[in-house]
Amino acid sequence: MVYHSQFNDESAGFRLVGNVPILPLKTTHKGPAPKGDANSVDIIDEALDLFKANILFRNFEVQGNGDRVLIYLTLYITKCLLKIAPMNKADAEKALFLIAQEQFSIPGESAFPLGGLVTVPNTRDAADTLRQYFTQLRLELGVRLCQRVYAVDPSKANKWWICFSKRKFLNKAL
């Protein structure tokens, strides 16, 4: 059974850009996401917690807007794990920072892999907000992923994380 996001409740009042909710984050990185409560689980914690279970599935029925962010983060985790597999923690942190900052596609651009799941932002400002939000997510996820993958030994990646790096989620990649 696939695990879905706890942020699917549309009555929670999260701001939407297209059909992507701008969810609160526990982060120091600047961006459009509101500050999250330090004691609660945010979407990045949720994506990391559910990654190993969800990566095993080829199908994912979207039950709400929070699932769209969860799918994007799951694909991004896979990309990150492929990149950091042979690295130590310091090199991995640098590599993930660079990956987060590189140019990437957003909904409405031809290279965006989730074109059918995520609607195109209706204005240029909305597209810029979405790009900033995805960048903020990518930066914070890189930091937290390194904390988990290198928790035991900073000189090498944990094999129980890296073994999932070659799996394809929804047969897509970022």
UniProtKB/Swiss-Prot annotation:
Checking Gene3D superfamilies in the record gives: Actin-related protein 2/3 complex subunit 3 (1.10.1760.10)
List, in alphabetical order, the GO biological process terms annotated in this UniProt record: actin filament polymerization; actin nucleation; Arp2/3 complex-mediated actin nucleation; exocytosis; phagocytosis; regulation of actin filament polymerization
One GO term of the cellular component aspect? Arp2/3 protein complex
Instruction: Report the protein name in the record.
Output: Actin-related protein 2/3 complex subunit 3
Q: Which domain of life is it from?
A: Eukaryota
Compartment list: Cytoplasm, Cytoskeleton; Cytoplasm, Cytosol; Cytoplasm, Cell cortex; Cell projection, Pseudopodium
Quaternary context: Component of the Arp2/3 complex composed of arpB/Arp2, arpC/Arp3, arcA/p41-arc, arcB/p34-arc, arcC/p21-arc, arcD/p20-arc and arcE/p16-arc. Interacts with carmil (via the region between the LRR domain and COOH-terminal proline-rich domain); carmil is required for Arp2/3-dependent actin nucleation. Arp2/3 complex, MyoB, MyoC, and the alpha and beta subunits of capping protein all form a larger complex with carmil.
- Give the family this protein belongs to, as stated in its UniProt record: Belongs to the ARPC3 family.
* Keywords, sorted A to Z: Actin-binding, Cell projection, Cytoplasm, Cytoskeleton
Molecular function, one GO term:
actin filament binding
> What is the annotated role of this protein in its UniProt record?
Functions as a component of the Arp2/3 complex which is involved in regulation of actin polymerization and together with an activating nucleation-promoting factor (NPF) mediates the formation of branched actin networks. Seems to contact the pointed end of the daughter actin filament. The Arp2/3 complex is involved in organizing the actin system in cell motility and chemotaxis, in phagocytosis and macropinocytosis, at late steps of endosome processing, and in mitosis.
Q: Which organism is it from?
A: Dictyostelium discoideum
Gene this chain is encoded by: arcC
Which PANTHER family does the protein's record reference? ARP2/3 COMPLEX 21 KD SUBUNIT (PTHR12391)
**Short name of one Pfam family for this protein?**
P21-Arc
